[in-house]
Amino acid sequence: MTRRLLMVLVLATALVVGGCGNKEKTTTEASTEGIYLDVGGLKYQVQISRILNPSDIEDRNYLTQLPQGTLPPKADEAWFGVWIRVQNTNDGKSLPTASNFEIRDTQDNVFRPYAQVGNVFAYQPVDKLGPQEVLPNPDAPAGFGPIQGSLILFKLTNTSLANRPLEFRIISPTDPTNVGTVDLDV
């Protein structure tokens, strides 16, 4: 009888302890691309990152709508793209998406993105991403293309590309201390 009672108690304890683990873990750091980062109540995922080649037909489309006066990369620089996907997993709350991003190398050099207003592949922050919505919109060119992410464009030095890992940082629009970081696969 005591053995049976002990077995029932062990099973009951396991059920109680197992039921306590329903809360999802919040992740703000990732050592590789593809991991969802929780920033500002939204989930951000780096789909891919890579150097862009202005001579490549596909890449030329990513390098349009740059601010007036933007110079092409110098001999020791390169265009570098980070494609992200943003998801609002909340059921009843619209939230703003991040507009502040940066890349840091191991020497603490910081790079900020170029705005590309009007480029259909470029990331455009929104004031309110609705409940259960995704950015880019799945029906937009950035959403239904092979990458399924919006481009954030940087100009990096070749030296910084060698100072790996590069750290991509997403700063929350509502709390600048809430920062998501991911090491980019270069």
Placement of each model-derived feature along the sequence:
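Sec-dependent bacterial lipoprotein signal peptides
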Residues: M1-G18
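Conserved functional micro-motifs across diverse proteins
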Residues: C20-V186
